[in-house]
A protein has these predicted regions:
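Flexible glycine-rich active-site/ligand-binding loops centered on an Asp-His dyad
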Residues: 112-148, 182-195
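Generic secondary-structure signature for well-ordered alpha-helical cores
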Residues: 12-17, 45-49, 102, 120, ...
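Catalytic-pocket segment enriched in acidic/His residues
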Residues: 149, 154-255
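A generic local secondary-structure boundary/capping motif
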Residues: 83-88, 141-145, 160-165, 230
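Extended, compositionally biased flexible segments
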Residues: 2-110
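Short, structured patches in soluble enzyme cores that scaffold and shape functional sites
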Residues: 95, 99-101, 123-126, 130, ...
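Conserved active-site and cofactor/substrate-binding residues in soluble primary-metabolism enzymes
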Residues: 2, 6, 31-39, 51, ...
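Tryptophan-centered motif/residue detector
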Residues: 53-56, 133, 143, 154, ...
Length: 255
């Protein structure tokens, strides 16, 4: 068994058993961003679940893009419930976009305007954050990236028709956990969400054949990064994320 497969199996086994890893076994840890993405794709293929969404955020340094697929079993309509057995219970307040057109992987480059013309709806989203490792934040960013950038679930609110992206960039996010309002950003913290989605669409051409052949599809939801950093819920927490003009999304830990 090769290193990529060993690493993918370790992440899957840790999730199934609800245990944490101190490190990747048998020297299988990713040594590059390319290997981290190969591990993501191997986990995806081994689990056999359909992609329903993607998360994408700005890169830094050698990590030119941070992104991960989110499978159909991890996407929930608000109001949603997650298990109290989740250890970290990290919470991010986000805005997500649903594509109305396929964006197949191709040699040409997708532009920001291509993305603008491909988006159907926009929605408030809550990302539930978990790690399969024993520390937070994960010390090695490549490990976090291989672990689907620490995604556990994506909860989406009511969708509204896509409108002026400049107005969306200037919205103010609010996150409330157990009636306590967290600090969130006014204005999109990750630059330009449409440019991020264009980077994601172009990134498909360098993924494994399993992902490359799929590309991005009409109906895919793309969430574009946190407006609050990461805050943390506790047992039986009730979480609400709000954006003016978009509405809200709700998550509860109680099952």
């Amino acid at each position: 068994m090769d290193r990529i497969s060993i690493a993918a199996d370790a992440l899957i086994d840790a999730e199934i058993a609800n245990i944490v890893l101190k490190e990747f076994p048998n020297l299988s840890a990713p040594k590059s961003i390319e290997e981290a993405f190969l591990i993501q794709d191997a986990v995806l293929e081994k689990r056999g679940r359909e992609i329903a969404a993607w998360k994408v955020g700005p890169g830094s340094g050698e990590m030119t893009i941070t992104c991960a697929p989110i499978t159909v079993d991890r996407v929930f309509k608000s109001p949603a419930k997650l298990a109290n057995s989740n250890r970290l219970k990290g919470i991010e307040c986000e805005i997500a976009f649903r594509l109305g057109k396929d964006l197949p992987s191709m040699g040409a480059t997708y532009s920001r305007d291509d993305i603008k013309n491909s988006i159907k709806t926009v929605t408030v989203a809550i990302e539930a954050v978990e790690t399969r490792f024993d520390n937070w934040p994960v010390a090695n960013p490549l490990w976090a990236l291989a672990d689907n950038q620490s995604n556990e679930a994506l909860i989406i609110g009511d969708e509204v028709e896509f409108f002026d992206e400049q107005q969306i960039k200037g919205l103010e996010g609010r996150l409330v956990i157990d009636q306590q309002e967290m600090v969130a950003d006014a204005g999109f913290p990750g630059g330009d969400p449409l440019s991020l989605i264009a980077e994601l669409a172009n990134h498909m051409s360098v993924r494994s054949s399993y992902v490359q052949e799929r590309g991005l599809r009409s109906g895919d939801i793309i969430t574009t990064g946190s407006w609050n950093g990461v805050d943390f819920a506790t047992q039986n927490s009730l979480i609400k994320a709000y954006f003016d003009e978009l509405g809200s999304a709700t998550l509860e830990f109680n099952c």
